[in-house]
Amino acid sequence: MPPLLLLSALIFLVNVLGGAPGHNPNRRAKMISIHSLSELERLKLQEAAYHELVARQFLSEFKPERALPTDRSNTFEKWFLILRGQERAVSLKTFGIRLEEVLVNELTRRKQVELRATMQMQEAAGPATSGRRRGNAVQRMFGRIRRIFSGRRDEPFLPREFTRRGRRGAVSADSLAELEGGALLLQTLQLSRISFPIGQRLLGSKRKMSLNPIAKQIPHVVEACCSFIEKHGLSTVGIFTLEYSEKRVRKLREEFDQGLDVVLDDSQNVHDVAALLKEFFRDMKDSLLPDDLYMSFLQTATLKPQDQLSALQLLVYLMPPCHSDTLERLLKVLHKVAENCEDSIGIDGQLVSGNRMTSTNLALVFGSALLKKGASAKRESRKTRLGIDHYVASVSVVRAMIDNWDVLFQVPPHIQKQVAKRVWKSSPEALDFIRRRNLRKIQSERIKMEEDALLSDPVETSAEARAAILGQSKPFDEGSSEEPAVPPGTARSHDDEEGAGNPLILEQDRPLLRVPREKEAKTGIGYFFP
């Protein structure tokens, strides 16, 4: 009898808690964006991708280094830069440095602007109060430095109230330029946590991971240039290849290096902005596609198209978030340029000339800028062991990434299952929290879509429309199977309650190749019910 009672109790708990990952007969998984994943899920995604690539023998040249117990990122140096005065602003460059340094410099400049604005407000308040407040500011600065040395390694140096707000909702921003206030501190913290080499994030690192999605980490110069090209350069013939003004490009580059508020408007030349974007990636100290994965990316050129895309997906998962986010932004604009390569008929019926820049032409331009040889690759000959020329392989890889940019940054259902199982093994409570939060988000989105559909559908009378919108056309019966009408904000207003609701109805699994996901990525919803 005791074994039977134990088995019955286990079955009851499984039914109540929703079961372990991989057992979910009532729901179907779908492709999700990597931007909807929490920091913990991103780490588990990297682990799953690493083991999958090792099994496929794509990481033969990759030698991960284990993290030492004393390993920590240069958080002190980053914070000390933020606390420095205006005299060091000129040293915070944008071009010719590592991608992570570009992001940190942008954060530092933003913080300096905030500090200068605060000091000006204090000086305007009066000399008596400004002297006292200046002394308090100095005390706060030394207090921060003291906490950096004496605090625990994994403890975030953030105000308690801001940390609580950060746990309740994720930071969501299209670029670093859109982050406001305390989000700058959280962004710096996330940047310091992910700045380890790929191997150290996978092997031996015991840092605590957040359950919030990672804010997108895209340099301002990349976002500004890509937005300008999308608005003004899609129909420009020979974009990225024709001549440009070196003087104007040098001036723009100096303005970005000086941290000025550069605005790219109609007065700018498209070819100058395109050349500036190329120079940023060409002069970057590291490679946008990490040096450690150089040979692995080249090896994908020997595969069939579908197998190549699957391998490229895994390699993208393995990249640091700042690299993958910047790569996605670049591939998105390059894909739009390639879509406008041929002549077309505009809305007004006039002929619109194409830019003549196919994905192959764009890959020829950006292949060597995105795939740079690392220390290990430089020792190799011009051809890999498989007999493929490095340049030809790089063009093939970049072309495939441009053509399928919207698929590379999605997670297919079978990878979702692996990630969910790894999260379950490390922390069942974390997986339960992520499930409940994602369920509330999806329910809110579904309710909003239903209300939008009701508003868009024609109705016979205004009374019927009002009743349909308010959910009063038919009273809700407690014994019926229908849902009561829920206001749009209801699911978000009960963050501390249990995630309850009707079963989620998801779309059918979609194919791997050429999946449009523009609308789906904007929702930022990750859902792990494999």
From Swiss-Prot:
The protein's site described by Arginine finger is found at: 241
Q: Which Pfam families match?
A: RhoGAP
User: Which InterPro entries would you find in this protein's record?
Assistant: ARHGAP6_RhoGAP, Rho_GTPase_activation_prot, RHOGAP6/36, RhoGAP_dom
Keywords for this entry? GTPase activation, Signal
Answer yes or no on keyword Signal: yes
Biological process terms from the Gene Ontology for this record are: signal transduction
Tell me the leader sequence span. Answer: 1-19
Q: Where is this region: Disordered?
A: 471-512
Which residues are connected by disulfide bridges in this protein?
Answer: none
The subunit field of the Swiss-Prot or TrEMBL record says: May interacts (via the Rho-GAP domain) with the active form of RAC1.
* Name of the molecule in the record: Rho GTPase-activating protein 36
Originating species: Bos taurus
